[in-house]
């Protein structure tokens, strides 16, 4: 509903206002419900006091998730072993981030500055971004934020794909022409920041005589139909994206939608798929999340015979200004040869 009144001119402040109102409403409503759940069974005063205490503690926890957890970056490091990783890429380090949602960051410059410093310390060979850089409109990419994005990089470059929010699909009155313009502006601004946008295209990374392929799935109008799909997308034709990619080369595919993994695996195209999109619904406690009830794959590492999938929990937030246990994530993957 919050997108109804959002257009190109008011996208940032209107989204932040809507998210703030929704966040306050959720915090107070849930805390109040907990208070009454304690009191209703017996309707005794002592249980009302216990309910007030429980509701207050819950409210404090929610407040912590908005003020602290939301920007408390977590670095997840993992080794991934493959039999077909070339010798030259044994030990190759990839920093993977996703879903920045710049337009709904409370203080984008401070948050991006901290992110750039963490990734600079990691000093990865490659920087990969999994889509949803902006929230509504390309105007969220200001000269200041682009300068900070230019500092987020890998030694072999920085590569990005589009997410559903980057397409302009959420602007009130969005048209195909408006979406094309928004995508072109996002691409142009990314290039100015030193990031290369992959749109159904592949680049080849080299180490001596060895090479691997990095493929980026574009977020086409056809995929927009699946932007809120809960089930895995099977039978989607991805073959055109890999027409010029050699069959025997180790391939990393970046797809904003993790639901595409089955189509990628069934075709034998991707050895490692990197995705975002779900954010663990910004609620994850002790590895449990509402997302696990809705999606086949929702966070972390998944494996099938034909490939692996890693879903990053994202950096920014959308809908409400909080990350309840679901810290913003920087994934550091080190490739290992079996």
Label each region the model flagged.
Residues 8, 51, 55, 60-67, ...:
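Short, well-ordered helical secondary-structure segments
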Residues 40-54, 59, 64-98, 103-122:
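N-terminal signal-anchor transmembrane helix
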Residues 88-338:
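Soluble catalytic domains of enzymes that build or remodel membrane lipids, polysaccharides, and related
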Residues 1-71:
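Non-catalytic terminal accessory segments
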Residues 33, 43, 83-85, 165, ...:
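Generic structural motif
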